[in-house]
Swiss-Prot record:
CDD domains, sorted: SARS-CoV-like_ORF3a
Membrane-side (Extracellular) residue stretches: 1-34, 100-104
Domain CoV 3a-like viroporin TM per the UniProt entry, residue ranges: 33-141
Biological classification of the source: Viruses, Riboviria, Orthornavirae, Pisuviricota, Pisoniviricetes
Compartments reported by the entry: Virion; Host Golgi apparatus membrane; Host cell membrane; Secreted
Membrane topology: Multi-pass membrane protein
GO CC, one annotated term: extracellular region
Marked site: Involved in polymerization: 133
Organism field: Bat coronavirus Rp3/2004 (BtCoV/Rp3/2004)
Protein name (record): Protein 3
Cytoplasmic-facing ranges: 56-78, 126-274
More info: Bat coronavirus rp3 is highly similar to SARS-CoV (SARS-like).
Domain remark in the UniProt entry: The second or the third transmembrane region are responsible for Golgi localization.
Length: 274
């Protein structure tokens, strides 16, 4: 207990020779040991602060986060927790090393360092994914894949759970019931409307890049969802160098969902003229 209480209040180290008092040949139990450390920094309060941040970090995972500022705040708290944990680990390790007590905690520190390295590598990979997607969403969302397409106005990047043969992209204008926002939705994720869709999208992962081509659309009158358009993409098996980009409106390469349908006779599955 004395050992852990001393470590809990560690600070700047003053090396002193260890002493054992009140020890006699007749008594091998009752003795007072002086640990050669003196505290000048409230290290224990720093540990308590990190523990409270870790509890808050874990508790925040059960709260539904929908807005971007909430996601950014949550990720910022996680980053602060990780940095404080790294600081506490290195600081306490140096103190124990100077005190000559490192061997007792070597395996614990090795495990903590390995976990920190894994966390740092994951952060680097997410940054690389941001560069591939031209968006900050890989840092905000924990998804492994992202559906991306790029226009002159905006770089779209929507989280996706796995690689599938078909992607269904929903577009709504928010005017009727069931009310859909004026945005693009895939699964439970959405992106605000800034520009139209393109006739091909790409799924980006850490080591994955899969291309999908627009195959067909379903209009709102075909599905029962008012004022919504569904864009259906199918996976391409061709190489990216052989993908031919077809524009639906003949010029811009994007589709504006607010435009009137350009099809003569919409059916349940209206094919897009390519």
């Amino acid at each position: 207990m004395d050992l852990f209480m001393s470590i809990f209040t560690l600070g700047a180290i003053t090396r002193q020779p260890a002493k054992i008092e009140n020890a006699s040949p007749a008594s091998t139990v009752h003795a007072t040991a002086t640990i050669p450390l003196q505290a000048s920094l409230p290290f224990g309060w720093l540990v308590v602060g990190v523990a409270l941040l870790a509890v808050f970090q874990s508790a925040s995972k059960v709260i539904a986060l929908h807005k971007r500022w909430q996601l950014a705040l949550h990720k910022g708290i996680q980053l602060v927790c990780n940095l404080l944990l790294l600081f506490v680990t290195i600081y306490s390790h140096l103190l124990l090393l100077a005190a000559g007590m490192e061997a007792q905690f070597l395996y614990i520190y090795a495990l903590i360092y390995i976990l920190q390295i894994v966390s740092f590598c994951r952060f680097i990979m997410r940054c690389w994914l941001c560069w591939k997607c031209r968006s900050k969403n890989p840092l905000l969302y924990d998804a492994n894949y992202f559906v991306c397409w790029h226009t002159n106005c905006f770089d779209y990047c929507i989280p996706y759970n796995s690689i599938t043969d078909t992607i269904v992209l929903t577009s709504g204008d928010g005017t009727t019931q069931p009310k859909l926002k004026e945005d693009y939705q895939i699964g439970g994720y959405s992106e605000d409307w800034h520009s139209g869709v393109k006739d091909y999208v790409v799924i980006h992962g850490y080591f994955t890049e899969v291309y999908y081509q627009l195959e067909s659309t379903q209009l709102s009158t075909d599905t029962g969802a008012e004022n919504a358009t569904f864009f259906i993409y199918s996976k391409l098996v061709k190489d990216v160098d052989h993908v031919q980009i077809h524009t639906i409106d003949g010029s811009s390469g994007v589709v504006n969902p607010a435009m009137d349908p350009i099809y003569d006779e919409p059916t349940t599955t209206t094919s897009v003229p390519l």
